Regions:
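Short, structured beta-strand-loop surface elements
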Residues: 24, 33-101
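Short beta-strand segments
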Residues: 1-34, 48, 60
């Protein structure tokens, strides 16, 4: 798990606890359920703050597409029972969290 802090255009910050997906030495998060405001804020303002194991760091949220999306989605599938419990959510979106430089 991790805690991501995203900021909207007015400068208001919000935090959200998300599942941490570790793949190929990188950190990913997935928007696969109805509460997606955090995802929209990260797309609009990709500089995010992330807490992992009690340590906060700055990251840049990068939308994942193509082959990389397919690989990560296949590595962390959403089983049918989970999708059913979520009410068959909208299509999944994945962000890669790159360390800010």
């Amino acid at each position: 798990m991790l805690v991501i802090t995203t900021t909207d255009d007015s400068g208001d910050s919000r935090t959200r606890r998300l599942a941490r997906l570790d793949s190929d030495g990188r950190i990913y998060v997935s928007a696969h359920h109805w509460p997606r405001a955090w995802y929209r804020r990260a797309i609009d303002n990709p500089e995010v703050r992330v807490e992992i194991d009690g340590v906060e760091s700055d990251f840049v949220a990068v939308p994942v597409t193509g082959e990389e999306f397919g690989r990560v989605a296949a590595e962390f599938p959403l089983p049918l029972p989970v999708r059913f419990l979520m009410g068959f959510p909208p299509p999944r979106e994945i962000l890669r969290l790159d360390p800010a430089t």
